[in-house]
């Protein structure tokens, strides 16, 4: 007979129940409507539950049932191109059942249990298999071959394996001990999926954004944070990363952000082409939409749901990038739940375990050798929304302690319409040194020295700007006036990028290198001309400088760049010939 509890108290999304036999993090059905909730605290006879749906109308005395299992996600063919809410309910299914607004107590399977997939076995009868071993494949999209793996906690010898078209819940393989395997497996979201070993990240995540790839690269399997005030471009940067990063799978979590931003993603991604494969971007994307008007408790679930789906694809040997926009909203949800539980508040009202929860999430990133011997990676990029752009607040500070790349968005840059508004003086990447060999081998041997020179120049420019604001640029020596012009070119030509331009939105490494080298070449030639006696105003009149600024928008980039370099050589030769 099913044991049921009784609601004792309701406080927003937190419900206290008596008489319920449940374990920590068990999934429960709350009230007459059967709202989905999760056990977060057990105090003697009382069980405290956070409810993932609106609790209006629930009253003391209503029943509460434990499912006996923790919050889990369904993993298998059909994940790609899906759009879920925070607890892996497909939004298109909820739309059919309840209309434009999500009804309460509605349950839906994470994967389509009726759709047929063609299963091709790679294991055979008599094979000994263990957790993580691949027993077959399904061609899920044109480019992604979905590997069907044995769940991590199962092992045995195959007594029967089938081939053909099956649903995700059909038995496709039977072990000698009677265990039946399906294409789908369930996994608790709070439990990291096991791996054989973790590895050191050695390859960069190519984002197509010059300031990120060039100055502050993140490694595949790395962690990065994008903190910034409102309107500084966090979401556009995150969306650009989701569109153009060179990973095979993208998991995008809209955690507590505006509904319109998720609507933008939903309308844009199906129409955009993946630059690596030429296929629609949606084919490699899983979207988790948990907007600001959805119940706060589900924000935590959405983050864990997203990282668990990412781990599943990593186990197949794929490179995954996960965008969480924004982790601050998740932290605010934790603060609200914590205050409802009447826990002792920490700094600025956040719970004392804030840093532990953030670390728990970011540490699930990394490069790993999976149980089946494949090497995959998860790169986690979390947006942080500090109120008023104050980077000293707890969420930003705790995130900074964990992540190795910090892309600091600056309100002043965004007000000057400099996008991406990443402040090159405040940002840093701790992966730079470990990726230098990759850049030297795959881009150009002189790429790293060029980058270091550019950073030194930008640093010097910031020091000179203080003098310029006091006495004006005319008071500076000629070489420093010229340096200011070179750094202006670096800022406007190399660092600035238009995320909505058909050509400039994505800049390949070869293109980035040529633009940077051309600016440095112009700067070196200008300094040489200055030493030979040419006045600064004459150098600044050269047309090649203006033409170079337009090259990044040209579809025939190499032709245009070659023409500019030829023009540059001619102009400087004529200057020296005077």
Curated annotation (Swiss-Prot):
Q: Which InterPro entries does the entry link to? A: ATP-synt_VA_C, ATP-synth_a_Xtn, ATP_synth_asu-like_sf, ATP_synth_asu_arc, ATPase_a/bsu_AS, ATPase_F1/V1/A1_a/bsu_N, ATPase_F1/V1/A1_a/bsu_N_sf, ATPase_F1/V1/A1_a/bsu_nucl-bd
- Protein residues bound to ATP: 228-235
Pfam families in UniProt: ATP-synt_ab, ATP-synt_ab_N, ATP-synt_ab_Xtn, ATP-synt_VA_C
User: Quick one: signal sequence residues?
Assistant: none
Give the CDD domains listed for this entry: ATP-synt_V_A-type_alpha_C, V_A-ATPase_A
GO BP: any one term: proton motive force-driven plasma membrane ATP synthesis
What the entry lists under PROSITE patterns is as follows: ATPASE_ALPHA_BETA
Which molecular-function annotation in GO is an example for this chain? proton-transporting ATPase activity, rotational mechanism
Q: How does it sit in the membrane?
A: Peripheral membrane protein
Enzyme's top EC category: translocase
Q: Which EC numbers does the record give?
A: 7.1.2.2
What keywords sit in the KW lines? ATP synthesis, ATP-binding, Cell membrane, Hydrogen ion transport, Ion transport, Membrane, Nucleotide-binding, Translocase, Transport
Recorded catalytic reaction(s): these are: ATP + H2O + 4 H(+)(in) = ADP + phosphate + 5 H(+)(out)
Q: Where in the cell is it found?
A: Cell membrane
Q: Which GO terms describe its cellular component?
A: plasma membrane; proton-transporting two-sector ATPase complex, catalytic domain
Its biological function?
Answer: Component of the A-type ATP synthase that produces ATP from ADP in the presence of a proton gradient across the membrane. The A chain is the catalytic subunit.
The record's listing under HAMAP family reads: ATP_synth_A_arch
Provide the assembly information. Answer: Has multiple subunits with at least A(3), B(3), C, D, E, F, H, I and proteolipid K(x).
Q: What protein family is recorded?
A: Belongs to the ATPase alpha/beta chains family.
The protein's name is A-type ATP synthase subunit A
> Taxonomy-wise, where does this protein's organism fall, top ranks first?
Archaea, Methanobacteriati, Methanobacteriota, Stenosarchaea group, Methanomicrobia
